[in-house]
Amino acid sequence: MIKVLIVDDEPLARENLRIFLQEQSDIEIVGECSNAVEGIGAVHKLRPDVLFLDIQMPRISGLEMVGMLDPEHRPYIVFLTAFDEYAIKAFEEHAFDYLLKPIDEARLEKTLARLRQERSKQDVSLLPENQQALKFIPCTGHSRIYLLQMKDVAFVSSRMSGVYVTSHEGKEGFTELTLRTLESRTPLLRCHRQYLVNLAHLQEIRLEDNGQAELILRNGLTVPVSRRYLKSLKEAIGL
């Protein structure tokens, strides 16, 4: 079965696509969302094989949403748009395909045929990594999904239970993004095997006798620095 997630702010557009896909014996619609914030959470939770994604949505567009997904768990992306002018941009965002609204069933059939062919070649549907810088980090916590702006991130830590983002206010949220992805797509600096830090919130570095160090942030929280990353940290702040 091919697991499909639909993200579109237009109820009628979602319904029309759902009706057609439900007629396909090898398609399972695992969820529908009306905006990108819900969509990000659904991708993380439901792990769809294919994401049918509207480009024009309020607050966060479909193109912006793709840039917030972890490339290690990104499904095939089929963009939906009423304007052909978005086609080139869609493929720059590693789209598998794009469909113009209103969706033509014959055109959709061709897309599904290509998807089936790709699925027969491999079991895991991962797309190439998009190196566009992240403006937000999608987080979950306190029974909600929210987008934390980069300027508000104090540090990120990796634990046995996952990756956690701590804000400058000291609030913590879980993210599906890996430390490796965050390091490559944000200004956060690696200071430890399990930590990334936002130097904009750095107040003090305390050096220790064993060659390690500890960062004191403006909010009073501390972040460890290992010997391996101490030199690059000093260089980053001009020492």
UniProtKB/Swiss-Prot annotation:
The modification 4-aspartylphosphate is found at D54. Phosphorylated by BtsS. Residues 137-239 form the HTH LytTR-type domain. The keyword DNA-binding applies. It comes from the Bacteria. Keywords: DNA-binding, Phosphoprotein, Transcription, Transcription regulation, Two-component regulatory system. NCBIfam families: PRK11697.1. Member of the two-component regulatory system BtsS/BtsR. BtsR regulates expression of btsT by binding to its promoter region. This is Transcriptional regulatory protein BtsR. It comes from Shigella flexneri.
